[in-house]
Amino acid sequence: MKNIFKTFIILAASFVMAGCLKSIDDTGFDPQTPNISFSEENLSIDQNGGELKVQLNSNLPWRVTSDAAWLTISDENGLEGKELVLTVAKNRTRKERIATLTAWIIADKPVKMTVSQDPTPAGESFTYYVKVDGDGLAEGFTWETATTLASAMEKAADGDKICVAAGTYTPITLIPGGETEEERTFEIHSNFTIEGGYPADAVTGAVVDPANNETILDGVGSAYHVVVVSAAKDNTPAVLKNVTITGGRTHTANQQTYRQAGENLVDIGLAGGIYIGKANFVMENCKVIANAAALAAGCYISPNAEVTFRQCVFQNNSADSNGGGIWNAGGTLYMYDSVVAQNTCGQQAAGYYSIDSGGTITVSRIYNTLFLENDCTQKNEKRSGGALYIRAGSDAVFVNCTITGNKAGYGAAISGHGTGQEAAKLSNTTFFNCTITGNHANNGGGGLFAYNVGAQITAYNCIVSGNTSSGTAAEAGVMDGVDANRVLVKNSVLGSSLVDATGGPVGGWGFSTSMLGELGYYDNSLTKCFPLVVSADNPAVDQGLSNADLQAVAGGFSPAVDMDLLLSGQNAIQRTKKSIGSYNAK
């Protein structure tokens, strides 16, 4: 009986299913044809920005994107048609800008609309005046009606200038997308100039005097980035002058959490002091001191940025991992008469770090700069790059520089580190007229050191002497198994010898560090250097390359080496005869 009942149930279920299938087959399925469109093809808005509304018509689920960071969309996807709210940032540039919205149901059949925004009118350049006790509601057009720094920076557009009185300023404005107090920063969002160094009680007619009127931008140990440069790259640069940047402290771990500032994705673990996005940026007479970060404690330079530092100091910055002082990740840096000193890191590159980013070559042209007492051994005695750590995809040239007192496991003055593959992009470093002395490596390369075959280091007309190593290659050398020609020292002083164009010793000459004077300011120097002790037996005084020979070997670089600076020396004395090192003998 049970078997008969089970059979009956199975047969009944089969009839029901068959009926359902027949019903489905009879009715069929008629998918909708995708239909999507914007209610407008073009919209425009004035320079001040704000909100726009547009209807997106769609009969099926859709997605929409904007190709511009300055235009955001309330909804990036939906199931059916919807009114979208477009938020447009203020246009502080002198150019009209256009964004394109792209919407689709099927990816290969999108629809588009454009949003154009008026520029800030040409000729409307303003100067704003800022004091510590300024009024945030004041217009800020005179010292007597001074405003706050946050207010002035919010108002400023391309071509404007902000004059800042002496005192200490802390950031109060969140980076775009920021959520916590630590994300407050001074954002240089446009190509304007900030100039500190005016008297605290400045009145109309006050004259800038930075030596007596220190202007401090202070992150008070909590701001992830004291300064963020997010201005769009333009022929006219953003400029920062006569300020001290201090007290930055990024997130303690590199969490790869990003904020969109202009066209830049800013990592909260990078750059406690100053984060430089894809911008044309000039910094003059500034100090970046006592900042901390997971990575790039003092300064981070983004890919495709073009940056100039003049008479700047990067000192006492400390990274938990790589990059104590400056980290250049695919930018072009011109640095003049500056100091990179006493920076530390837990891993590589205490002083200056150069590495390509996504295939973008990192370019460095560094003149008359002192690299002093940078140390990457405090947490791990084997780490590389005390003063300089030059990685794959780098084109670095150092002219008239002094590198002294730096410490590392490998490469106290410089560690060149390529990919380890001969055919890959090299780490290329060239020194002209540099003095490299008094650096110490725990493992190898107190002076010049190539870590692998991907590195090439060449020194012309340099003093490389008085460097030490507890391992190998006190003055210059390579890692075991690496071709010795990866480090070349030509027409220079190397250790106790004068060497010729082949790197071989020149008979009849010797050298010791007693032939160098005390580190200090000499003649017209803006940074400290070692003078030469003038004596008949000091080869650095009248040997080395002639002016013509120097210009010849330095003539093939792009960007070009500045020939005037090449011949002027770190002591800013025109070279009238042969001499070796950063100090031009008289």
Named regions from a protein language model:
Residues 224-228, 498-499, 503-586:
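C-terminal accessory segments
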Residues 84, 99, 111, 126, ...:
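The right-handed parallel beta-helix/beta-solenoid scaffold, focusing on the short coil/turn
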Residues 172-191, 203-208, 282, 308-311, ...:
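Predominantly extracellular beta-rich ligand-binding scaffolds that present long acidic/polar faces
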Residues 131-176, 185, 226:
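Acidic Gly/Asp/Thr-rich repetitive segments characteristic of extracellular carbohydrate-active
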Residues 150, 171-193, 202-242, 246-280, ...:
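Extracellular beta-strand-rich solenoid/capping regions of secreted or surface-exposed proteins
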Residues 38, 57-85:
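Surface-exposed binding patches on compact interaction domains or structured appendages
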Residues 16-42, 111-125:
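Bacterial Sec-dependent N-terminal signal peptides
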